[in-house]
Amino acid sequence: MKALYLGHAAVLLQTGERNILIDPFINENPSCPIKVQDLPKIHYILVTHGHGDHLGDTVEIAKRDSSTVITNFELSSLISRHGISTHPMHIGGRYTFEFGSVKLTPALHGSSISEGDTPVYAGNPCGFLIEIHDKKIYHAGDTGLTKDMELLRRENIDLAFLPIGGNFVMDLWDAVEAVKMIYPEIVVPIHYNTWEVIKSDPAIFQKEVEKLGLKCRALKPGESIEL
């Protein structure tokens, strides 16, 4: 299985049989090296919350590829009005799909979509714990540091994607504390340097993670990691 980092919080998981895209902020993402038209067929889209830099191009991709969108119940209800297939879930719920299982994990953040100038409530933000071919991937979504992360240690996570940009999410120092609680085999920092307000240094984060005896890969957009 390959995990391709597309910048900001967008990650494409390729199993060989299915392509699973997380938080598809593609066309308007200044750090993404491709456009939606360059993506392979996407079978499933996982959306952590409704903000534009995560919901992104979900509807366009789902319409193009007849993808199933996995997200929280409220956001699922809102975007299903566009005629796309959705699978609603909620925090703590786990479901087995044809590619593997998905569990929604807590995230400390907000979630809304914009209708004109008005933000519309879009359910609880979440992270995803994904199990494919006996490998476990955790995508934290947008979140601050939370003690709930201690519960993830028992999952023996192979690959964790953690935000480090600060301001809207935890900074790199809080992300290091998250690593101590989760203790994944490999960590990849996300959600940083897309804009000045979330500027962070992944080299410092990597150094601190490696002090814990763990692996950190600060992937550049367009780079991938094999599991």
Swiss-Prot record:
Pfam families per the UniProt record, alphabetical: Lactamase_B_2
GO MF assignments: hydrolase activity
Keywords, comma-separated and alphabetical: Hydrolase
Superkingdom, taxonomy of origin: Bacteria
Signal peptide (UniProt feature, chain positions): none
Record SMART domains: Lactamase_B (SM00849)
SUPFAM superfamilies, per the entry: Metallo-hydrolase/oxidoreductase (SSF56281)
Keyword Hydrolase: yes
Protein's UniProt keywords contain Hydrolase: yes
Listed InterPro entries: Metallo-B-lactamas, RibonucZ/Hydroxyglut_hydro, UPF0173, UPF0173_UPF0282_UlaG_hydrolase
Family: Belongs to the UPF0173 family.
Protein name: UPF0173 metal-dependent hydrolase Tlet_1100
Species in which this protein is naturally found: Pseudothermotoga lettingae (strain ATCC BAA-301 / DSM 14385 / NBRC 107922 / TMO)
Lineage: Bacteria, Thermotogati, Thermotogota, Thermotogae, Thermotogales
